[in-house]
């Protein structure tokens, strides 16, 4: 459960990096595909090279979902309901992949904004990303 302090930390971080979120999410995907090659199976038709148009386009979608979740941090489940349905019924992404993506996102944030990613903010962002992953896999059952 995200505390009010966690919510404030997440919103503050997203406010500071918002203009780069799409770029960071594309970098996150490229990092995930390189570090965890099994995640590539969901994108057989993509050019998965870092910086490819398809990775950038999907990074934009991930950024949009994260921004939507952050903007509706008090009700992430409603904000991402349609995306949750898509992942359950059509995409059938292995739930562990959301954890891998979250880890890679934390790494990218630490690379680009080490001074912003204090231990408190890191913990809050990790909890937020776990909440997003939980929402996206909640309908799998």
UniProtKB/Swiss-Prot annotation:
Which positions bind heme b?
87
Gene3D superfamilies recorded for this chain?
A: Globins (1.10.490.10)
Q: Which residues cross the membrane?
A: none
> Which GO BP terms apply?
hydrogen peroxide catabolic process
Globin domain ranges (all copies): 1-141
Enumerate the UniProt keywords alphabetically: Heme, Iron, Metal-binding, Oxygen transport, Transport
Q: Does the keyword Transport apply?
A: yes
- Quote the tissue specificity entry: Red blood cells.
Top-level division of the source organism's lineage? Eukaryota
Give residues annotated as binding O2: 58
The protein's matches in Pfam families, at most eight in alphabetical order, are given as: Globin (PF00042)
One of the entry's Gene Ontology molecular-function terms is:
organic acid binding
Do the record's keywords include Iron?
A: yes
GO terms for cellular component: blood microparticle; haptoglobin-hemoglobin complex; hemoglobin complex
Per UniProt, subunit arrangement is:
Heterotetramer of two alpha chains and two beta chains.
Q: Indicate the family of this protein.
A: Belongs to the globin family.
Chain's role: Involved in oxygen transport from the lung to the various peripheral tissues.
Name by which UniProt lists this protein: Hemoglobin subunit alpha-A
Q: Which organism is it from?
A: Phoenicopterus ruber (American flamingo)
